């Protein structure tokens, strides 16, 4: 039986960041990943500038496939273009990006075990027991960063309600010739489904394209996505992959005795844009900080003492996700009114992109919308 200070389950951004931080602070740490890295991931591969600011090391240039400072928005016959002086996101291949993050954790002293699927997590008086497809491990703290379908989360909370899960499908497609180069910027299409959006993101020799929808519109996602590809003259040459995204901003338990949830496993994702990497990195660091703080002082990592992690997450980004959820609900209930308002002026989109750059947040956007909505609505009627 392997015994550790910390077991991290999941080799995505949340898990890799948490494992690296724990190992750097001298905790005996192992990261368990069910796949063999690098492995494919359902993701557009967009990393916001705000997310990059949370990393203490720059992303290597060879991993970055495109830098984006131009946003093209489409809504029916309307189009809006926002050009910023600084990038608001970069595009990567998630398999390579995640592998790089795990390599950083390994270089910092974390042990990495691949191809071990966690099948059960049992907290007890002597620590937390983790059973995998191959072995049994114990640790004083387990950090569950194993995604939206988390096994670790079963020891913390009930499964996500279906109404609290958005859905997306995506694929990467070889580039085709067109009048306007794909590399000019990201393209986002609204209004083609009642609530949600479709995207085309440029990469080196292909484009990442997909469709994300709110919970009420998940039944016809694949058909709607294929119609979109046909309209754009894109032919799928890779598998279409789909998965759920938890709506952040909803109060859920994220800790139990000896257990911390991070990233999608904790429900930390942007309910307005679907961004998850930013909150995976943030929560991974906070999870590691909580584990290091308690274990280094020989404080029992029970539910009560780990509550500091939940409070830190709320103050760091949780309150802002609540504001994002409120704004996304407004779009869900009044899509035509709000999209009409957004596409009648550059200001709402420009303000929204500032969030991706880390210059503002959803609470400030909410206040901005309260102040400016009456005038914007008059101009859109």
What residue spans do the PLM features occupy?
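Glycine-rich FAD pyrophosphate-binding loop
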Residues: 7, 23-42
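C-terminal helical "tail/cap" subdomain of flavin- and related membrane-associated enzymes
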Residues: 292-381
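Beta1/beta-strand and adjacent pyrophosphate-binding region of the FAD-binding site
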Residues: 1-12
